[in-house]
């Protein structure tokens, strides 16, 4: 059970590309545009100390907390799964604490990107708690950021009885000049060792699916020691955590 955040995000972007009033040129963003993904857990935690407004999004199976600084998902609770046998608390998958970081980041990079190592977009939103209402099948929550005559909307979409988290970007360019941006997404996770026992070992690490290889696991040590960057026309990236895939 993996919250297919990045998969669904990319599907949405392919299906519904951002709308702009000015024609934009395609560009390949340098990797330095992407907010840093540190190999040190201490650095990762330090990187997340500055926060914006924390808002809550909830449907019937999932509760999310989103930081308006960047619009990152910093917490997810699986409401139909107990934290442990006999517990009344839901299982927490994504979290952002001093001891453990596992968050889903996404944004816009490139020449005119609003998410860089120098800073993230500070979105505005009306309200702080959004819940799927009785009889409602879809919850849509827009976050808005304006800069230099351009309005950016990052829209989260939750559907009833679904763990998918839709993330759409809408851009209204009234600046009079073309802009160059492209979407990025990444999962940020504290480095951990696999645990469990001999009879039932558990695994925490990464997994790729690409047009060349349907499924391949990568440990955190692989990520630390190797360049795992690949080019593919289709695929997904996931973090496997214990028995949740």
PLM-predicted stretches and their roles:
Residues 1-34:
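Subset of Sec-pathway N-terminal targeting signals
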Residues 29-55:
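Short, Gly/Pro- and small/polar-rich lid/capping loops
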Residues 54, 58-245:
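Soluble non-transmembrane domains of integral membrane proteins
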């Amino acid at each position: 059970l993996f919250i297919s955040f990045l998969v669904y995000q990319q599907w949405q972007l392919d299906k519904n590309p951002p709308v702009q009033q000015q024609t934009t040129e395609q560009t390949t963003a340098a990797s330095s545009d992407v907010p840093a993904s540190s190999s040190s857990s201490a650095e990762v935690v330090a990187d997340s100390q500055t926060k914006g407004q924390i808002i809550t999004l909830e449907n019937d199976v999932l509760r999310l907390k989103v930081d308006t600084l960047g619009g990152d998902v910093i917490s997810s609770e699986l409401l139909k799964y107990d934290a442990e046998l006999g517990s009344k608390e839901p299982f927490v998958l994504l979290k952002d604490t001093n001891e453990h970081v596992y968050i889903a980041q996404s944004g816009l990079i490139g020449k005119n990107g609003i998410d860089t190592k120098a800073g993230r977009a500070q979105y505005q939103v009306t309200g702080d708690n959004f819940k799927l209402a009785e009889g409602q099948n879809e919850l849509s929550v827009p976050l808005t950021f304006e800069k230099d005559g351009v309005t950016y909307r990052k829209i989260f979409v939750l559907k009833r009885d679904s763990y998918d988290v839709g993330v759409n970007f809408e851009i209204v360019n009234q600046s009079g000049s073309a802009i160059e941006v492209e979407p990025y997404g990444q999962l940020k996770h504290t480095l951990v060792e696999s645990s469990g026992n001999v009879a039932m070992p558990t695994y925490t690490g990464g997994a790729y699916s690409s047009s060349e290889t349907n499924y391949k696991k990568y440990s955190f040590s692989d990520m630390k020691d190797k360049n795992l960057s690949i080019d593919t026309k289709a695929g997904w990236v996931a973090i496997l955590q214990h028995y949740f895939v």
